[in-house]
């Protein structure tokens, strides 16, 4: 969410106990995140679903919730911040998005946390910068029922 971190960082998570600060944790099985408003060149201001994810137990990042993405995606710099590095065993793969443009990636397994739920998940570590942070389905959505409430402008993760 390069260039949009400011707006997203102003969001707070809400649990069933009410709104909490940006570093607070949900204490039960339900976590809500308000959508963020961003400018679209086609549609003006649009509301997009995001979630606060902790990567490798230390790095807090807002990610777009993308139910159409098979796998979570992070840019090169975020991978470096959480201590990822390429090894000889890593295979350089390519993933394709809208318009069939490809992105070079390496699949890595990392520790993630959403609310109080901690888990390991595979993610696609992009070898370029110009990609959004996407929270994809593989190894993440199996822990939660994910509901995008368009009218209420919130994303709800229930366990």
Model-found features: residue ranges?
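Pepsin/retropepsin-fold aspartyl endopeptidases
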Residues: 1-159
């Amino acid at each position: 969410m390069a260039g949009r971190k400011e707006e997203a960082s102003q969001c707070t998570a809400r649990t069933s106990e009410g709104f909490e600060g940006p570093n607070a944790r949900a204490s039960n099985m339900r976590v809500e995140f308000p959508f963020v408003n961003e400018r679209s060149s086609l549609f003006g201001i649009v509301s997009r679903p995001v979630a606060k994810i902790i990567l490798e137990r230390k790095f807090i990042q807002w990610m777009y919730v993308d139910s159409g993405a098979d796998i979570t995606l992070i840019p090169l710099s975020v991978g470096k911040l959480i201590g990822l590095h390429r090894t000889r065993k890593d295979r350089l793969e390519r993933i394709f998005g809208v318009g069939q443009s490809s992105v070079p990636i390496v699949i890595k397994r990392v520790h993630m946390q959403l609310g109080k739920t901690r888990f390991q998940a595979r993610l696609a570590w992009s070898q370029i910068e110009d990609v959004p942070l996407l929270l994809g389905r593989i190894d993440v959505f199996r822990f939660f029922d994910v509901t995008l409430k368009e009218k209420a402008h919130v994303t709800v993760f229930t366990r």
